[in-house]
């Protein structure tokens, strides 16, 4: 099975001080060990780099070089499928924004969900499952709920 990754999950895996680092790392390891794959969209990596280099969020943010190296590692990982938002994803994004009457604060999550769904990804690794519950087509797997 292929699982899309949300930025919140990537942050938890990469930031050792993150409250859910151990759980996220364990879950990722378990999924990969059983042969599952991860799907990653470019917007996740852009948000990751933006967040981890922010001096207002962290006492010791990553340097841009470290952030970019980690981003490239996710993008080029053998167990990762690169997923780009193609025409069908944009159509689905517009449809879902209207169907679910979502506002401006839901734009990026909706585009991410549509990008993954258009690539036949139906599972999402996230720490923010409530942001995606409106999309029946995706099942969210929060790290704390896996044993």
Predicted regions and their residues:
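Acidic, PIN/NYN-like endoribonuclease modules and their adjacent C-terminal/linker elements
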Residues: 2, 110-147
